[in-house]
Amino acid sequence: FTLKKGEKIAFIGESGSGKSTLVDMLMGLLPPNSGEILVDGRNLSAQNLKNFRQKIGYIPQQIYLFNDTIAKNIAFGEEFDEKMLARVIKQANLQSFITSLKDGANTLVGDGGGNLSVGQKQRIAIARALYLSPQILVLDEATSALDNESEAKIMSEIYKISSDKTLIIIAHRLNTIEQCDKIYRVEKGKI
């Protein structure tokens, strides 16, 4: 299949069908067993892999947070820009939660995010992926732990901010992918 810049696509299928493996190949994390992955007409290789990966914002289903502040987890340990931080906090629907905290975005999350709910961790991961303004945004069942209302708000915001981005979504809820240009079913490792 071909994925064009700015296109929104989704992969659906049963657990174990190969959706995540396919996306790992598209991100250059796994080499394909056969065939090739072309980026702008060039084979994805060791020479261009690092540059390609820098264009990707990835939101996994299983989130890892380190024992530091919300802000530093979003900026992934880098020095952070307050305006950019505020922007992604809003985009990830975190502002009311952060406002309710005594220390705001400077609140410690605890080891592995132990002080947070699964939904709060997912929203922090979404903010992290958006922080560096990636050209390609990959959501691997990234909203699965959210309630329907939170998921709808976040997906609406993701579609809005990804109007000029390529969006790749693995989802189990069809309402998550209703705005995609193409939807691919993955079965037994085949599209």
Specify the residue positions occupied by each region the protein language model found.
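ABC-type nucleotide-binding domain
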Residues: 1-191
